[in-house]
Amino acid sequence: MIYNGGKYNQHWSTKKLSELGTFSRGVSKHRPRNDTRLFENGKYPLIQTGDIKEANLYVTSHSQEYGEFGLKQSKLWDKGTLCITIAANIAETAILAYPMCFPDSVVGFNANSNESSELFMYYVFEYIRNSIQNSASGSIQDNINICLL
């Protein structure tokens, strides 16, 4: 989809999102997700889609923490990663204020610095959110596929 092909951005070239950076799905391999072993001696911040929806640009707090067992089945994402929700809360975005883990209902985006930035892409996703939400497919709970991005 191409938005705003007007005279003010004629010096920009049209690019696929995948050319602007790397999209990777969050990780939460272990089931059930509420297994207490995941959280024992927790010290690795964990956020969910609701935390991203509630954030104002940056995710600055978390309410859960993985322990070593939890981290082994997940991934600790770098500060500055743009988070994009793909399930439950569709196309909500926020940038990590510090390293955190997130589940597979979230996609992380890290920009190619010579092409874009996470901050710029945050605003791009704010602009196209409704279009992405309208593309969501699901019966009871909407979701989108990472390929849609």
Q: What name fits each language-model region?
A:
Residues M1-H30:
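Non-catalytic DNA-recognition/assembly elements of restriction-modification systems
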Residues K16-T22, K53-T60, Q73-K79, I95-C101, ...:
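Basic, amphipathic alpha-helical recognition segments used for DNA target recognition
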Residues S18-S24, R33-E68:
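DNA target-recognition patches
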Residues P32-N34, I95-L96:
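Short beta-alpha junctions and helix-cap segments that line functional grooves
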Residues E40-G42, W77-G80:
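Short, well-ordered loop/turn elements at secondary-structure boundaries
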Residues I84-T85:
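A generic structural signal for residues embedded in beta-strands
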Residues E92:
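Short glycine-rich, flexible loops that bind phosphorylated cofactors or substrates
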